[in-house]
Amino acid sequence: MSTMKKEERLVNKVTRLLRRANIPRWLHHYGPKKFETYVLCIGLLIKQIYQLSYRRAAKLLAEYYSIDIHFTTLQKAAKRLPRSIWQSLLAATIEFKNTHLAAADGTGFTRSGPSQYYMKRIDRKTLVGKPVQAITMIDVEKRKFLAGCFFAKPHGEAKQVSRLHKQSPTVPDVLLMDKGFDAEYLHQWLNEHGTFSVAPVRKNCVRGRHRKLMRECMDWCLYWQRNIVESLFSALKRLFGTSIKSQKSPMINAELFCRLIAYNIGLRLWTFS
């Protein structure tokens, strides 16, 4: 496939997502209407796919897409685009209506800080900076990310499952979780909202109707399919990198949501080679 057709395919995918998510053509009400929403989204997606800086992403847009945009425009877009827009775009990548089996888990992304060589030279023993926490929900059968939430500081994973469940475009019938998500209030909330949760019971936890059911009738063959979420985390880090360059929460959300969106719609570095 020629380079021109690949460029048109990327533009068509992004514009189709924006229409499906009901995102306006312009994100600001006042001021000059110079760059449409799809231009900003393409620039931020390309930055994550190629793992570029903002300057090089703007230069690539100018050379291959004939879009003359300053790199600070992309920086401001990453900072100002609300999290709801990114979640709407991620939900727009899901074209199926039913999710039989889903899984939720968390992972971490390192911050781009001093290198290990520099740390060794200054005789630093302790770690510098805290990793970015990512908690996501995936469709096990389709291998797609349904929802995600990201934090610059550590948060309780079990408390975010209800948030992921509400943001998911489809309601999963069964949700697989590891032992860290075992909480009776969470199991009850999921049952009330049409999802049966499967998670191993914590040690020395005896109270709770759902926990008693899991202790007596745990389906381990079904539970081990939860490993698919670990495979998706591995693929995400191998394709788009293991580190985060941004420091502020809005820009961290933009970086990680762009990676999830690019993965769901099949944008890889090898598709542009």
Name each model feature, range by range.
Residues 2-48:
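Basic, short loop/linker segments at the boundary and entry of helix-turn-helix/winged-helix-like folds
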Residues 30-41, 46-49, 83, 87-192, ...:
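Polybasic low-complexity intrinsically disordered regions
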Residues 50-56, 240-244, 265-273:
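Short helix-capping/linker segments at secondary-structure and domain boundaries
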Residues 54-67:
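DNA-recognition alpha helix
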Residues 67-83:
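Major-groove recognition helix of helix-turn-helix-like DNA-binding domains
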Residues 174, 179-246:
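Helix-centered, glycine/charged polyanion-binding patches within enzymatic domains
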Residues 247-273:
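Charge-patterned, long linear interaction tracts outside catalytic cores
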